Amino acid sequence: MSSKLIRPYLVRLAGVKIGKRVHIGANVTFDTIEPRLIQIGNDVTITMNCVLLMHYLKTHENGVIEWHRGKLTIGNNVFIGANTVITKPIMIGDNVIIAAGSVVTKDIPSNCLVGGYPRKSLDFLKLKRASKTFV
């Protein structure tokens, strides 16, 4: 069995909900605290060395540290560039491209190109119809 098939299979076994035609690159790290809270749509490519988390810590002025968690949802026809870090529970819409090396801390609407640290909307994609192959 090729690594293209093994990675999604193993991630599904851990509890992540994965759609069809999903490619997971080498060294992609998924949050292991509650993988069932991660949902990945169809036709998604997550390239190498990405980190997907759905928990974070929030500090207050009085020194109290709160631990938060939530659902991480990745829509259909999404491309996540190499070395991207998703640091909070967020929703990524359909037809989204996230540039390599981005840090994503907020929801991303559909039909959008984002990149940077922290991520910034670079452009709204003018897609009439999503193709079967994104890359």
Feature roles, as predicted:
Residues M1-G15, R21, D43, Y56, ...:
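Terminal amphipathic alpha-helical/low-complexity segments used for targeting or macromolecular assembly
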Residues A14, K20, G25-A26, D31, ...:
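Left-handed beta-helix
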Residues T32, M54, H60, L122:
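Glycine/Thr-rich phosphate-binding loops of Rossmann-like dinucleotide-binding domains
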Residues I33, I80-A82, K120, L127:
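Generic signature of intrinsically disordered, low-complexity segments enriched in small/polar residues
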Residues H60-E66:
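Flexible, solvent-exposed loop segments that connect beta-strands
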Residues E61, C112-L113, L127-A130:
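Short, glycine/charged-enriched secondary-structure capping and boundary segments
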